[in-house]
Curated annotation (Swiss-Prot):
Protein name as catalogued: Uncharacterized membrane protein YhdT
Similarity-based family: To H.influenzae HI_0974B.
Listed NCBIfam families: PRK10633.1
Transmembrane listed as a keyword: yes
Highest taxon listed in the record's lineage: Bacteria
Keyword Cytoplasm: no
Gene: yhdT
Any one GO cellular component localisation term in the record: plasma membrane
Membrane-spanning residues: 15-35, 45-65
Membrane topology: Multi-pass membrane protein
Signal peptide per UniProt: none
Localization annotation: Cell membrane
Keyword list, A-Z: Cell membrane, Membrane, Transmembrane, Transmembrane helix
Amino acid sequence: MDTRFVQAHKEARWALGLTLLYLAVWLVAAYLSGVAPGFTGFPRWFEMACILTPLLFIGLCWAMVKFIYRDIPLEDDDAA
């Protein structure tokens, strides 16, 4: 198999995994956090699910792009 496809499949698996992890963390944060006010004055479930979780996953997406994704040529070598 062409190494471009191996890398593309690896990147797709990581993206799907991070997406499913985000969904799981969001659900846990939204439904298991309390309703007591948090440090911003919003309910704790809102702070966890809508403020802290997205910030965490922005960092994880940055790390995934920095360390997992690679620049690969998209043109087909056989077409030239």
